[in-house]
Amino acid sequence: LTRSITVDVRGELADLKDNMNSMIGTLRATTESGREQDWLKTNLARFSDMMQGQRDLLTLGRMLLTELAPLVNAQQGVIYVVEAADDRDQRQLRHLAGYADNGGEPTARVLEFGQGLVGQVAAQGQLIQINDLPPGSVQIESGLLNAAPRSVIVIPVRFEDQIKAVVELASLDQFTASQRAFLEQLSGSIGIVLNTIEAT
């Protein structure tokens, strides 16, 4: 499926060549779509199995990011969980875990609903993806690398109609449609597990 017919012909043979090339293209697209669906289903099942029975919030957050970031080619990630604010009438987002996170002491990081992209996603319940970030916005750092990500995706995690958490991932590449679909579907499973932990 990696080749096309490339002969110089006219008439009926040209039509036949064009039809064959069209069929090859369709078959190639169908095969690729099938691979993406297999990848999606396999990884959703793997994460579901991995999260099953988890009762510790911090362990869940760390495990999720450790497995999720490399799978979707993210080099950095954080997860914030929703909790009651001090006045109990408001909800806020508390930093739970990070993956290659540069941000200092996690327990000190709290965001209000509507504050920054993470807070906005929590307030609206809608995924936000930003591509081609300006230089200097946030940095992905390692011993050899200090680079701005190309794409950031912020995903609401909900159980029924309640926001339970927000996951933010940054990548040096743009997130693909398949990765985005996977993250959206996975967020529902994460919401169920977070609700179960909260209830126990």
Question: Where are the predicted features?
Answer:
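Short, charged helix-helix connector/hinge segments
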Residues: 1-8, 12-15, 46-49
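Short beta-strand-to-loop transition segments that serve as allosteric relay/switch motifs
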Residues: 9, 99-102, 145, 165-175
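Amphipathic alpha-helical "output/dimerization" segments
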Residues: 15-22, 26, 159-162, 174-195
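Signal-transmission linkers at sensory-effector interfaces
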Residues: 22, 29-53, 196-200
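Signal-transducing coiled-coil linker helices
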Residues: 50-64, 174
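GAF sensory/regulatory domain recognition
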Residues: 66-69, 76-109, 113-115, 135
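Signal-transducing coupling segments at domain and membrane junctions
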Residues: 101-106, 131-151
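A short, aliphatic-rich beta-strand micro-motif
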Residues: 150-158
